[in-house]
Amino acid sequence: MGFITKAIPLALAAASVINGAEILETRAGVQTLADKYIVVMNDGISDKDFDSHRSWVNRNHRRRLIRRGAKAMGGMKHTYNFPTGLKGYSGHFDEQMINEISKRADVKYIERDARVQINAIEQQDNVPSWGLARVGSKEPGGTTYYYDSTAGEGSTAYVIDTGTDIQHEEFEGRATWGANFVDDMDMDCNGHGTHVSGTIGGKTFGVAKKSNVVAVKVLDCNGSGSNSGVIMGMEWATKDAQQKGADKAVANMSLGGAFSQASNDAAAAIAKGGVFLAVAAGNDNVDAADSSPASEPSICTIAASTEQDSKADFSNFGQVVDVYAPGDSITSAKPGGGSQVLSGISMATPHVAGLGAYLIGLGKGGGPGLCDTIKQMAIDVIQNPGASTTSKLINNGSGM
């Protein structure tokens, strides 16, 4: 079993429509959060109209609480306003309030909020990592990583995850804390995010050894959070990247789950904002077309390979996969110092985010177009990649 941060979001199956606004129904077995919802506004709604809508929601919510005298619902919690136009909010509402919201002409759709969590960790001690050598070589079995000395200098990687140990020696002061949307502890008390960050920008384990890393925490110490919190992290990363130069930014999301329109729309908003986004295809050995945000076509979707250049047995597959990257038995940083070995789609994805940062350092340009560049540079070597799936494995073009 591999390792991936897994979101369990909403399906589009049998969506109901009330006065034009879809209330997306949940698939059997989905772990939803009681009375919690994500509301997405119509495309093109103005800031003024969005403010007016939220004021209406807050007024009506307060009136309902006073009128019914029942246990309090929390009301509106998060507000989303991506610079590329996606607007919405999440909150704690009763069914009657949600039905009222769905009747508004300015609402596009509503999803139930859902749990985000990490699957079991596969760990093996004292095993050398092979992923870096494979990225820098056209042949398997190498032990040396060949790369240009620019090494991603000037690029910034946003790691949307469990946080990052920014004091770890691997980052040499290049890692900073960005934002936290899940708890009040600005630290990685799980280890997943630090491992991912090390693969992107660590001095020893990183594909882009001189890149900057920004921690965006959306999952807690148990590797758990919510879709609404993850979307908040995506919005924050997009805005911060645009302030600092989106063409120099990449983002990594080693998380995913069943199809969610809100998750896909948020991922598309990152790409539209000019940020290269690498996302895990999924860790369930199924077609990734039903996974989110992996199924969003404007981002770069990653599957996991083994040291033998075959599909990892846990990796998702399918037409939505853009490239393969090393994901089995990968060594990287762990919180508090030192390293650990983990396997999963979570480990493959940062190889691609790191390669994106590396190419930015080489002056290859940034943004979602980097995915096409990476696919063009990839080598056709993956054995048994899965039905309707690319056999391309990433390569940094070093010529070795």
UniProtKB/Swiss-Prot annotation:
Any one GO MF annotation of this record: serine-type endopeptidase activity
One record GO biological process: proteolysis
Keyword Protease recorded: yes
Propeptide: 21-119
Residue ranges of every copy of the Peptidase S8 domain listed in the record: 129-400
EC number in record: 3.4.21.-
One Pfam family matching this protein: Peptidase_S8
Residues with glycosylation annotation: N222, N252, N396
Domain of life assignment: Eukaryota
Keyword annotations of the record: Glycoprotein, Hydrolase, Protease, Secreted, Serine protease, Signal, Virulence, Zymogen
Keyword hit for NAD: no
A GO CC annotation given for this chain: extracellular region
Leader sequence residues: 1-20
Subcellular location: Secreted
Residues at the catalytic site: D161 (charge relay system), H192 (charge relay system), S346 (charge relay system)
Residue stretches making up the Inhibitor I9 domain: 36-118
Function as written in the Swiss-Prot or TrEMBL entry: Secreted subtilisin-like serine protease with keratinolytic activity that contributes to pathogenicity.
Similarity remark: Belongs to the peptidase S8 family.
Protein name listed in UniProt: Subtilisin-like protease 7
Gene transcribed to yield this protein: SUB7
